[in-house]
Amino acid sequence: MLSNKAQNSGDPKAWRIKGDQSRWWTQPLLILAGIALGLSMPLAGADNFGTDVADAFKNGTFNVGFRYRYEFVDWDARTKDANASTLRTRLVYKTAPLFDTFLTLNMDDLRPIIGSNFNDTRNGKGQYPVVADPKGTDLNLASLTFTGLEGGKIVLGRQRINRENQRFIGTVPWRQNEQTFDSLSIDYAFTDKFKAFYSYVDRVKRIFGPDDPLPTLPTQALSANFSSNSHLLDASYTFSPLFRLKGYAYLLDLENDLLPSPTPLSIGLGTSDSFSSQTLGLRLTGKQDLGGDLNFSYAAEFAAQQDYADNPNNYDENYYVVEAGLDWAKFGFKLGYETLEGSGVAGESFQTPLGTNHKFNGWADLFLVTPPGGLEDLYIQGTAKALGGKFSLIYHDFSPQTGSGDYGSEIDFVASWSFMKNYSVLAKFALFDGDNNISDINKFWLMLSADF
């Protein structure tokens, strides 16, 4: 349904679906999902249905994983350094398929061990830098997956959604508690070359859960959940290995559960609806074998974002990135330039509230939220495989997109090893050197993982 503004105005921005009126067309999708699941169940097997269900659970698979991480943060803006020692225990159960449908359950438990000298966004230890791994037990997956569609699948329930490189939509797997989505998703390959995806998102389970912060803490912006009435749509066509084009439309109608509009956010983004946005974009990627173990790859992307639904801000900002890389034998090199525009006014910059933002713009996490003046990031990366492990070194130079001056520069490094199939170890650091009175920050991680 179009807003009155759209019906009576020539303004192109007015021709948008109202965020609070778009649920009407998600109901048929839910009905279709139910019909698809129902049609997959042969009537002849109705008498044995109870037995079949029992067998599906009996023949299911169970996995357990442990991930220990030590994180050290030295931030000049805080009086004390953070030392976080946490253990995540993950339990995953998946039923055997029944009528092309299976159930997935994932429970994560996160506990500080040895010590808790850090601000986990919940414990009130504001004298320490933030390490966003709060204590708690969370049901991160509870979904039904139907695979009876040739070339496609339907997923209903709490699920992981990772689109492309996770710049806009991702699960933030680096944090101990993942971001997951209560949604209905349809993933379909029309041909080997043409693929499409749609998801309606009703709620976002964020990395800060499962508990909300206390009302007395200045972290109300970091609620455990986003209420959502959002639509995610993308489609890609592969012309050749050198040319793959992807288009997307991400209509995010998000509301912070703790901050009924128009309560101000502590991070300067306005009200609880300030993360709502409409993003339309195109991404071109490709790779080419140059011979002699030498391979070339590239990416070029442009996206336009504007306010959406009940976002009180009125903005229209762009995003673009160009990237080129060369891989030779066990070595790689990449050069890239990324821009997220900003007008210089709080709440009027290009944001990616559902992205895996730790992957981008430096691992020190200074730019998880784009500053009002926007962000330009020139980066160089080198990778190598040696000594049985993988190594990566990245240099970033950060500056505002609007105005003059610099934010600073950063050096990131990671080394990782996998062994005996089930085990891995990772060491990683980030060194941010701030300019123009922006505080320096240094981070170090040591992580041990075991999955069975």
What residue spans do the PLM features occupy?
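C-terminal outer-membrane beta-barrel translocator/porin domains of Gram-negative envelope proteins
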Residues: 112-114, 129-131, 308-319, 323-325, ...
